[in-house]
């Protein structure tokens, strides 16, 4: 990767890092005596919070998701190769595919669980799940969705969405790694996959207990 090509991105990322909650700000939120007090403290930071709306809806995740998406979109506009950002954001794409597949297989509307982040829009992913085809996503993603469908049609397992999207998330990471052919990306991808596997192992161990 050309360091000069990423100089503008580096500057933007440093600015965004400075907008992260400081230890003092986070502690101030944690010791708040009420939700309203916590939201008012958060409102004084870079997070855009409609205090009254959150108090009425009790839905806090959309605030965090919206902030994350703003930062993602800002970096996406500047980055020379979007594949680099995919290394970190493709997990949200596969999360959304899981949600949409489970919604399709179960007949339940679960779309509110989607996270508005990643290179591919909700409409694009929804069209992929509905038709098992798309001109706007990589072939590996289409292949994963088709395999999940085949498993569900053969065995009726809702878990097919989890099993195949997890598997193809790893495959997609490896594909990005091979395509970019950068040692630092290879190391990052290895660490990410190792951490996911460790998390899965710990979760499975706890469930057996």
Show the residue positions of the predicted features.
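N-terminal domain-start signal
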Residues: 1-209
């Amino acid at each position: 990767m050309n360091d000069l090509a990423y100089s503008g991105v580096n500057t933007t990322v440093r600015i965004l890092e400075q907008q992260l909650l400081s230890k003092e700000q986070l502690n101030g939120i944690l010791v708040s005596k009420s939700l309203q007090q916590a939201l008012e403290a958060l409102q004084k930071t870079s997070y855009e919070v409609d205090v009254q709306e959150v108090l009425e809806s009790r839905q806090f995740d959309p605030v965090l998701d919206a902030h994350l998406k703003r930062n993602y979109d800002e970096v996406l506009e500047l980055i020379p190769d979007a594949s680099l950002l995919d290394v970190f954001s493709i997990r949200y794409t596969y999360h959304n595919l899981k949600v949409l597949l489970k919604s399709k297989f179960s007949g339940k509307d679960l779309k509110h669980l989607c996270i508005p982040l990643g290179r591919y829009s909700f409409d694009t992913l929804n069209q992929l799940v509905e038709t098992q085809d798309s001109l706007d996503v990589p072939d590996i993603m289409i292949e994963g969705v088709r395999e999940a469908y085949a498993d569900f049609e053969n065995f009726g397992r809702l878990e097919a969405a989890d099993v195949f999207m997890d598997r193809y998330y790893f495959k997609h990471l490896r594909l990005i790694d091979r395509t970019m052919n950068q040692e630092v990306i290879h190391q990052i991808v290895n660490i990410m996959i190792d951490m996911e596997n460790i998390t899965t192992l710990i979760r499975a161990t706890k469930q057996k207990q």
